[in-house]
C-alpha cells in the first residue's frame, strides 16, 4: 500500500540544544573513565583521526544526570519554535523518536510534552 502524500508539509525550522559547557579532548577523562592503562594511547589516536575537538555531556564529571533526554528534547523544540516564530499552542502534534528515553513509562513524547 503506498504511503499517503504529504501535500503542504514543509520543514520551516529546526532546533538544537547542547547540554552544559563544552568538554574538550583534554577533559574527556573527567567525564568518561579510561578503560585501562593502555587506553590513553588508543584514545589519542582516535581523537586525532576523528577531528572532534569538543563534545557535550548530559552528565556531570561524577556521573550525575544534569539534563534528561526529555529536557534536552524540549529545549530543542523551544529553539525550533523560536526559529519558526510560533508558540507551542500553535502545534497540533508532537512526534518524537529515540532509541531510549529516560524511563519505560510514560512514553518519551509524553515526557517531552510534560517538559514543555
Where do the language-model regions lie?
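Conserved "HGTGT" condensation-loop signature of ketosynthase/thiolase-family condensing enzymes
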Residues: 1-93, 114-116
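Acidic, glycine-rich active-site loops and adjacent beta-strand->loop/helix elements
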Residues: 17, 97-102
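Short Gly/Thr/Asp-enriched flexible loops that form oxyanion-binding sites at enzyme active sites
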Residues: 100-113
Amino acid at each position: 500500500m503506498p504511503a499517503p502524500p504529504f501535500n503542504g508539509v514543509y520543514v520551516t525550522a529546526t532546533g538544537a540544544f547542547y547540554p552544559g559547557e563544552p568538554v574538550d579532548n583534554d577533559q574527556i577523562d573527567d567525564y568518561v573513565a579510561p578503560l585501562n592503562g593502555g587506553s590513553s594511547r588508543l584514545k589519542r589516536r582516535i581523537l586525532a583521526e576523528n577531528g572532534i575537538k569538543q563534545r557535550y555531556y548530559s552528565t556531570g564529571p561524577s556521573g550525575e544526570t544534569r539534563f534528561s533526554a526529555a529536557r534536552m528534547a524540549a529545549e530543542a523544540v523551544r529553539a525550533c519554535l523560536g526559529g519558526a516564530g510560533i508558540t507551542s499552542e500553535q502545534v497540533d502534534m508532537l512526534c518524537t523518536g529515540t532509541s531510549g528515553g529516560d524511563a519505560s513509562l510514560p512514553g518519551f513524547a509524553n515526557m517531552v510534552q510534560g517538559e514543555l
